[in-house]
Amino acid sequence: MILDNFFKNLIYEPVSVLGLLVFYFLLINLPISLGAVFKKKSSSAVRLITILVNLLITLQLLFRWSISGHFPISNLYESLYFLTWGITLGQLLVEREYQAPIIPSIAIPIELLTVAFACFVLPEDLKLSSNLVPALRSSWLVMHVSVVMLSYAALIIGSLLSMSVLFINKNKPLQIRSSSTGIGGFKLSNSYPVNDLVEPIEFSHSEELDTLSYRSILVGFVLLTLGLISGAVWANEAWGTWWSWDPKETWAFISWLFYAAYLHMRISKGWQGRKPALLASTGFLVVLVCYLGVNFLGIGLHSYGWIFG
């Protein structure tokens, strides 16, 4: 009977059912990831569930796309799931570079909270798909909004990795040798082997996480830059103005300046250690305000609507 109802709902309400499945799989994944931290060993089960979550969100968004007829990122419900899709993808890519149990243990709670907010906090009318106004029926919707959302995901991953660096070193001095260019470190080889005159520097756990944080933020910054440029071009085509300084545009520009300052200090000043990690961690709040803050105001072209009311 339960299975019959499940499959019946899956047929008639696939978006909602898949959204709930994502929530429950993340809920299962959370204690497993925390247990892996205490065991100090990466968990293949966590990675498999994360892959499943990513695939379920992909399927959910494809269903919504098929039902609505437009790219599924036009309201807050869709964008929250798209953001979660981006964070899970970023988590898997980071783990591919460096497997450490702390990586999923910091990413999964954010993914779970994001999905829980979409499932249980958003009013029902903000979950429904609606027809787009003529100005939004453009290929720029896919280019601009998806790139900006992926930039948020990458910046959030970078901030969370910096938080993990601070957490690991909370009771001791933080010394980082990781490369600010994100390409690793090398030194001259003492043995001068025939085929190679350099050998890699072995980075510590914190240094690996710091480098991955830097790389994630760099990717997020590039994507945010592309998102701002594409948004300006789209705005000029649709409304005849490149920039209108509405709340979302203003905060997006503030976010861009924030991360530009971080990258400038890392690259030109060789800034290492606790200070850049603190700054990158603070970036999480900047992205949060940029993404959700405008919806508490309920104004501007970029607002998805008033959340509580």
From Swiss-Prot:
Keywords per UniProt: Cytochrome c-type biogenesis, Membrane, Thylakoid, Transmembrane, Transmembrane helix
Membrane topology: Multi-pass membrane protein
Transmembrane segments: 18-38, 48-68, 73-93, 102-122, 148-168, 216-236, 250-267, 279-299
GO cellular component terms listed in the entry, alphabetical order: plasma membrane-derived thylakoid membrane
One annotated GO biological process: cytochrome complex assembly
Taxonomy, superkingdom: Bacteria
Compartments, as annotated in UniProt: Cellular thylakoid membrane
GO molecular function: heme binding
Matches recorded under InterPro entries: Cyt_c_assembly, Cyt_c_biogenesis_CcsA, Cyt_c_biogenesis_CcsA/CcmC
Pfam families, sorted: Cytochrom_C_asm (PF01578)
Subunit structure, as described in the record: May interact with ccs1.
Role played: Required during biogenesis of c-type cytochromes (cytochrome c6 and cytochrome f) at the step of heme attachment.
NCBIfam families, per the entry: cytochr_II_ccsB
Recorded family membership: Belongs to the CcmF/CycK/Ccl1/NrfE/CcsA family.
Protein name according to UniProt: Cytochrome c biogenesis protein CcsA
Organism encoding this protein: Prochlorococcus marinus (strain AS9601)
